[in-house]
Amino acid sequence: MARYFRRRKFCRFTAEGVAEIDYKDIATLKNYITESGKIVPSRITGTSAKYQRQLARAIKRARYLSLLPYTDLHQ
């Protein structure tokens, strides 16, 4: 039987040495929200607690300024 190895999750922001996550960096923020607009939890992405808080704050600011949608299309 073949054994499947799960890739080890790591925090991209820690690896790159990011000081602060910017709410204007929409390309990065879009990687951390689902198609429906929800914030992806850190247990899925592997983001550390410090950067998960910054990420949530940045996404909420971007939503408030209409840079990101709150939800997907309302149909």
Swiss-Prot record:
Presence of the UniProt keyword Oxidoreductase in the record: no
Functional summary from the UniProt entry: Binds as a heterodimer with protein bS6 to the central domain of the 16S rRNA, where it helps stabilize the platform of the 30S subunit.
Pfam assignment, any one: Ribosomal_S18
InterPro entries xrefs: Ribosomal_bS18, Ribosomal_bS18_CS, Ribosomal_bS18_sf
GO cellular component terms given for this protein: cytosolic small ribosomal subunit
Name of the molecule in the record: Small ribosomal subunit protein bS18
Assembly and binders: Part of the 30S ribosomal subunit. Forms a tight heterodimer with protein bS6.
Keyword DNA-binding on entry: no
One GO term (biological process): translation
One of the record's GO molecular function terms: small ribosomal subunit rRNA binding
Keywords associated with the record: Ribonucleoprotein, Ribosomal protein, RNA-binding, rRNA-binding
Naturally occurring in which organism (per UniProt): Shewanella amazonensis (strain ATCC BAA-1098 / SB2B)
Origin organism lineage: Bacteria, Pseudomonadati, Pseudomonadota, Gammaproteobacteria, Alteromonadales
PROSITE patterns: RIBOSOMAL_S18
Family: Belongs to the bacterial ribosomal protein bS18 family.
